Amino acid sequence: MPGFPQTVFAHITKPVLATLIASVALAAASAAAAEAPPRQSLIFEGPGGRTPLTRWVMKRDPSDSGRGHGWVRGAFPGATVEVPNVVNATPYSGRAGAKNYLGSVAWYRTSFQAPAAGRYAIAFTSANYKAEVFLDGRPLGTHRGSYLPFAFQANLAAGAHTLVVRVDWRHPQRQAEEGFHRTWFNWGGLDGEVDVRQIGASDLQAPTIATTLAGTAANVKVGVQVHNDGVTRTVKPEGSLVRPDQTIPLSFPAVALAAGATATVTATAAVPQPALWSPASPNLYELDLAVPGESSYTARVGLRQITWHGQELLINGQRLKLHGATVQEDVPGHGDALSPADQDGIVADLKSIGANAVRAQHPLDPALLERLDAAGILVWQGVGPVEGAGMWYSNSSKLLSEAEQQVRTTATAAGLHPSIFAWNLVDEVAGNGRNAAEVGYVRESTRWLHAHDPDRMVAVDIWGRHPPTKAGPIYSEVDAVAETDYTGWYEHPHDTPAQLAARMRARLASMQRTFPSKVLVISEFGAESNTLNPPGKPGSYGFQAALLQNHIQVYAADPALTAMFVWVLRDYPLTPTFSGGSIHRVIKHLRLIEGLNQKGLFTYSGKAKPAAVTVAKLYKALPAN
């Protein structure tokens, strides 16, 4: 999995950093959780030598008594599961769903072999919500926050070791107040891949890549952090960019490093006749980095240059007009712990509607991002706290610092993906921001991203019911602005199509007046649909399809609009009591399925609705680039 810096959300227990030698665990417990022959990692990108830890024993602990029973040592029975795993994938509605939504505690146990004594890294892609990690019965570290990678290191003896993780996803409202509001069900567990690897005398971390086009060539700059775990010495990385018919060597300078020191080195190379990455041609190179005999890092990257001027977004010098849908990583029976087949299904659904872009409110799993890279689907990636519409909880200095660190962790971990074209800092900000803390977060994070990742846009997403008429300081430094538009659903659902189209055009004109120098995006539009409502009436499949057609035709005709995203690709579980929200104040006698957001183009089980056909016809008539 990608290299990343230690974050404020993960805490390593200090005694472990000094040394952690295997203690004797219960032989039966270790045997029960022993790893099957290691499979290939779900994630291509990352350091060399990783072994995925896939087979675990999981035990629910609703009374939170496992610690008192000594479960930190792995002495508990349970069910064998494959990680990534969600403990509470069902139910999501009714009384049982309401209880399930409140969260619980569970314990995971596995074992692995250290082939030789030395220093090892144990890396987690994600855990929801709080994770306590124990190795051979001793505390290794803690982490808080979903969809953020974290890792711990320990000195290990050769032989078998037992890894235990306690996961706590109780109190979803408290999660929101700590900067981790969830936009769908409160799934809990080890919802991302876990791996272990031995660390050599050096370690390569946080690689970066930037492409600048020059005539028929591409000038590529690659950076990587080199950490020295050996004695004071000089370290010289090597690298290359490789395609079947082309190999480009990367020449890094040697760097003098004290023991325990880290430095960033860069290499530049001119790539003649490059195979550029774009939605129309998603060509990929393999990036190979190494300190020979000590460490390595591999990823698939795309050479592409993203630029923007005023309201225009360009890739490789060509204007981009993007169309797609928002995605929630959620599949029946799996929650947000998606299998490779689940991720393939999401990409297939996006391609079936003709999408060349996708929006995500939460950081996407690295394996899904790799699939989007390969498919040529650009990503509007949400980072930082996700709040309810118009909300902002990160007001204390501690929470504000953590909010900024969320942004940095995600941007560092996902920085090599050519599909990501924008970092979205806030979801549905009201007006000019809720308070000075939110404004300060956006401005500070924008400056950091511009300094560390200047080849991507930084954006904010406006709550369409409360847009500003005059842009305040929260927008002064961002490059793009998005706005939700539920005209025809929450707003004016009984208007004629012509009246709705006029309202949409008026909204776009207002956006352009307020933000004349920003790239403009419609981040959400849509309507709930199922078979419970009369044909053609609000809540029916026909109503949804007709409304989406109206929106898309208006947006496609506006030359100043860069992107549009249907809300949402698939129906998904929200809160168990959700029944449409404020829509019942404007549409009487609407029938919706409790617990599900039904604005999807596909049902929760994956069946295409008529709107999917309508959207596909319209999207596929638009240019891919």
Residue ranges and their predicted role:
Residues 42, 46-67, 71, 103, ...:
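Substrate-binding clefts and catalytic carboxylate motifs of secreted carbohydrate-active enzymes
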Residues 120, 133-135, 217-256, 263-266:
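Beta-strand-rich binding/interaction modules
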Residues 37-38, 59-62, 98, 103-204, ...:
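Accessory beta-strand-rich segments of carbohydrate-active enzymes
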Residues 105, 158-159, 217, 258-262:
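Solvent-exposed, conformationally flexible loop/turn segments
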Residues 16-27:
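Bacterial N-terminal signal peptides
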Residues 160, 271-286:
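Short glycine/proline/serine/threonine-rich loop/turn segments at secondary-structure transition edges
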Residues 148-154, 174-184, 306-480, 484-487, ...:
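Active-site mouth of glycoside hydrolases
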Residues 134-140, 244, 292-293, 316-317:
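Short strand-turn-strand beta-turns centered on an Asx-Gly dipeptide
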